Curated annotation (Swiss-Prot):
Listed EC numbers: 2.3.1.280
Keywords: Acyltransferase, Transferase
Binding partners and assembly: Homodimer.
Name of the protein in its database record: Aminoalkylphosphonate N-acetyltransferase
Gene name of the encoded protein: phnO
Length: 154
């Protein structure tokens, strides 16, 4: 799970702001970079717009010199098996040339503090088994590997 950090423990390295529908193209590009694949743009656009209206879904963008260079999504959910709120980080991506500059750490610290303020007992996330750099990043950030995730295409 997580060893909680305070937001002020991570020095700001970029500007963070909430995402809006005007950011659809930038967020789409980041998600395609994360997946190394292009998604159906119209389905993405519609889903992103719907998520922006959901009070339990939070998107934060990282900007350098006014350009979007990273993003994180935080989904607040009440888990029955915890009898408490959990902050699930579903996406965290930083453009490859910007990695290693603490942008991911700043985004993660924001999500952790946002979840903490909303009353969550922890944050959790899943990452593809192939993303070894991401695994090392999350371990450095205080996360512990505690579960296995199984998927099945439908």
């Amino acid at each position: 799970m997580i060893l909680m950090r305070r937001r002020e423990d991570v020095m700001p390295v970029c500007e963070l702001r909430h995402a809006t529908t005007e950011d659809t193209d930038s967020v789409y590009a980041l998600i395609c970079e994360l997946l190394k694949n292009e998604l159906d743009y119209q389905a993405f656009r519609d889903g992103f717009a719907a998520n922006l209206l959901d009070p339990n879904v939070h998107y934060r963008l990282a900007l350098r010199n006014g350009e979007v260079v990273g993003m994180i999504s935080l989904h607040m959910q009440f888990h029955l098996h915890h009898a408490n709120w959990i902050g699930e980080i579903q996406e965290l991506v930083v453009l490859p040339p910007m990695r290693g500059q603490k942008i991911g750490s700043q985004l993660l610290a924001w999500a952790e503090e946002e979840a903490r303020q909303a009353g969550a007992e922890l944050t959790e996330l899943s990452t593809n088994i192939k993303r070894r750099d991401a695994h090392r990043f999350y371990l450095r950030e205080g996360y512990k590997q505690s579960h296995f995730r199984f998927t099945k295409a439908l």
